[in-house]
Swiss-Prot record:
Major location category of this protein: cytoplasm
Name of the protein: Phosphoenolpyruvate carboxykinase [GTP]
Cofactor note: Binds 1 Mn(2+) ion per subunit.
Residues involved in Mn(2+) binding: K229, H249, D296
Xref: Pfam families: PEPCK_GTP, PEPCK_N
Species the sequence originates in: Mycolicibacterium gilvum (strain PYR-GCK)
Length: 609
């Protein structure tokens, strides 16, 4: 079909010539049956959900258990981000750097254009306008996703400010990021569809200079909801580098002292390391409270007062289900229980509820994430996929900070870097200054999780928890962080801390109880900001003793806390060649400032007896 004969092209609710021309071009290439413009309304959402139920993609859950909620089971080959198929196609290979897959942009466009040709046949091309961050921000970051997946349209309504209001912001000539997505599963006339269409060939491609995203073959979250990692981190990090701000893989937490003073903390952890749990923290120390601003992504800019302000560009939570329960994260459970949730790849109970590993109560019988019968103590496989998800509106979170949607953002007092390490890294360490903090973030390591492909359990370097999400060269990224610090008075900058909730004893036990008790560790960080707490200078930074932490009412072995805080010089000396190897991998663009910090660490460790 030509553009003239594709229904929906001539009834567009916009006069934006660039947008109209792009939609027309994509429609002619992909050959959908029709074009539809998503308006983000409740009526549209309900209509699409009903259609997805009819198609077998969604199963409606028991409204008494999970109101207005649905379960989707993906194709078993389409369950996580596909880092091996994710590309940063900058004009020059050096600008993608050693951590990214690169291909010449012209070559990639050629390959993907061939894949897109006719890829939407038998389907609807949805035009999905969206805004990352508050619509009334001074510089709203806008985008339009073209997709042939109704699952994506429904999820984008939850995860972004999507629809007519975003289209209005784009106006008749506004800039927007072009995000093109196709599941790559055309339907011939009369051909039956499958519940989760996708393609064995997958590409998730970013063109940083032109601010474009092209995704093909996957219907799964991070590969298909292009406002999430693709825009909010990969493209936004390139924008932030050019414009002098930070786009980071961080939660934003509001911690409130008994004196009613608020401290905003941004924290970077690799996927599945407790980011959402910390974002929805329930402090166990009397008088302390916490509220949630965001659980995954923080965009940080300097305010007029010289402080760093953060906004959460997202509109919902796309959380990992396994391990989430009423004990580990009651606020996430309350958010989900409010309804309006799309679950992907969790198990279904016989009474139409959902279940996953770690959730209270083990049902005798389930339908697992592959649609098969699962019997307690008989079935050996997991009922829910380790990377199964819930997609739910942020507005339902009972601990949501009232200012979460403030276009100015919230002033950040502390930045935490943390990963999952069994040894070496203490419970908390304070960086000596901003540049030392950048070094800590640059050397962050974590054990591999199920949220990405790869062998679970091996430690990989994950700088600032951004390894899979950098839109440009990692060395330039480190230098950008150092430069950000030079833009401000050191006294105005957030203090930087390094945390590790996951240290284990020789017998394999966790040394620290974690979860709500982490508020005790954050209290020390806040008291360091206020110059009220002591700490011990060590070769790796300033570390509290057990006496510096508020452990009142905590049933924990004092020796365990001492061990959790211990700086073992031998373990750190063993870490040095691993850091050296990582920096060699980063290559020629490793900043001098980072090399200086590394040399200083080596010297301090050598001086220890």
């Amino acid at each position: 079909m030509t553009a003239a004969t594709i229904p929906g092209l001539d009834s567009a609710p916009t006069k934006h010539e660039g947008l109209l021309a792009w939609v027309r071009e994509v429609a002619e290439l992909t050959q959908p049956d029709r074009v539809a413009w998503a308006d983000g309304s409740e009526e549209e959402y309900e209509r699409l959900c009903a259609h997805l139920v009819e198609a077998g993609t969604f199963q409606k859950l028991n409204p008494d258990k999970q109101p207005n909620s649905y379960l989707a089971l993906s194709d078993p080959s389409d369950v996580a981000r596909v880092e091996s198929r994710t590309y940063i196609c900058s004009e020059r290979e050096i600008d993608a750097g050693p951590t990214n897959n690169w291909m010449d942009p012209a070559e990639m466009r050629g390959i993907m254009t061939d894949l897109y040709r006719g890829s939407m046949r038998g389907r609807t091309l949805w035009v999905v306008p969206f805004c990352m961050g508050p619509l009334n921000a001074e510089d709203p970051k806008l985008g339009v996703e073209l997709t042939d997946s109704e699952y994506v349209v429904v999820s984008m309504r939850t995860m972004t400010r999507m629809g007519a209001a975003a289209l209005e912001k784009i106006g008749d000539d506004g800039f927007f990021v072009k995000a093109l997505h196709s599941i790559g599963a055309p339907l011939e006339p009369g051909q039956a569809d499958v519940p989760w269409p996708c393609n064995d060939t997958k590409y998730i491609t970013h063109f940083p200079e032109t601010r474009e995203i092209w995704s093909y073959g996957s219907g799964y979250g991070g590969n298909a909801l292009l406002g999430k990692k693709c825009y909010s981190l990969r493209i936004a990090s390139a924008m932030a580098h050019d414009e002098g701000w930070l786009a980071e893989h961080m939660l934003i937490l509001k911690l409130i002292s008994p004196e009613n003073k608020a401290y905003y903390i941004a924290a970077a952890f690799p996927s599945a390391c407790g980011k959402t749990n910390l974002a929805m923290l329930q402090p166990t120390i009397p008088g302390w409270r916490a509220e949630t601003v965001g659980d995954d992504i923080a965009w940080m800019r300097f305010g007029k007062d010289g402080r760093l302000y953060a906004t959460n560009p997202e509109f919902g939570f796309f959380g990992v289900a396994p391990g989430t329960n009423w004990d580990s994260n009651p606020n996430a459970m309350k958010t989900i229980a409010a309804g309006n949730t799309v679950f992907t790849n969790v198990a279904k109970t016989d009474d139409g509820d959902v279940w996953w590993e770690g959730l209270e109560g083990e049902p005798d019988h389930l339908i697992d994430w592959k649609g098969n019968d699962w019997v307690l103590r008989e079935t050996e496989t997991k009922a829910a996929h380790p990377n199964s998800r819930y997609c739910t509106p942020i507005s339902q979170c009972p601990t949501l900070a009232p200012e979460w949607d403030d276009p100015q953002g919230v002033p950040i007092s502390a930045i935490l870097f943390g990963g999952r390490r069994k040894t070496t890294v203490p419970l908390i360490t304070e960086a000596r200054d901003w540049q030392h903090g950048v070094f800590i973030g640059a050397t962050l390591g974590s054990e591999q999780t199920a949220a990405a492909e790869g062998k679970v359990g091996t430690v990989r370097r994950d700088p600032m928890a951004m390894l899979p999400f950098l839109g440009y060269n990692v060395g330039d990224y480190f230098q950008h962080w150092i430069n950000i610090g030079k833009q401000a008075d050191e006294s105005q900058l957030p203090k930087v801390f390094f945390v590790n909730w996951f240290r284990r004893g020789d017998d394999g036990r966790f040394l620290w109880p974690g979860f709500g008790e982490n508020s005790r560790v954050l209290k020390w960080a806040v008291e360091r900001i206020e110059h009220k707490a002591d700490g011990k200078s060590t070769p790796i930074g300033i570390v509290p003793t057990a006496a510096d932490l508020d452990l009142s009412g905590l049933d924990v072995n004092a020796a365990d806390v001492d061990e959790a805080l211990d700086v073992k010089v031998d373990e750190w000396r063993a870490e040095l060649p691993l850091i050296e190897e990582w920096f060699e991998f980063v290559g020629e663009k490793l900043p001098t400032g980072i090399k200086d910090e590394f040399d200083a660490l080596k010297t301090r460790l050598a001086e220890e007896s």
